[in-house]
From Swiss-Prot:
It is found in: Secreted. Disulfide bonds join 51-65, 58-69, 64-76. The keyword Ligase does not apply. This is Conotoxin VnMEKL-024. Residues 1-19 form the signal peptide. It comes from Conus ventricosus. Expressed by the venom duct. One of its GO terms (cellular component) is extracellular region. Residues 20-50 form a propeptide. The presence of a 'disulfide through disulfide knot' structurally defines this protein as a knottin.
């Protein structure tokens, strides 16, 4: 009888641990999904004038839609 009780307790602990782990994974996946859904695509950024197109003058990579600013020419490059 004692062995059965211990076995049931161990099973209950394992199941509750698994439920806690599964809940944590789902929260992380939801956070990732929310993070990526908030980001704009390159086309959306360009359309709204938030970045510069190919070969436009630039000083910093963040100014270009491709995020590649040539230090040699001072212009946005393609990917």
């Amino acid at each position: 009888m004692q062995k059965l009780t211990i076995l049931l307790l161990v099973a209950a602990v394992l199941m509750s641990t698994q439920a806690l782990i599964r809940g944590g994974v789902e929260k992380r996946q939801e956070a990732k999904r929310n993070f990526f859904s908030k980001r704009k695509t390159t086309a959306e950024s360009w359309w709204e004038g938030e970045c510069r197109t190919w070969y436009a003058p630039c000083n910093f990579p963040s100014q270009c839609c491709s995020e590649v600013c040539s230090s040699k020419t001072g212009r946005c490059l393609t990917w």
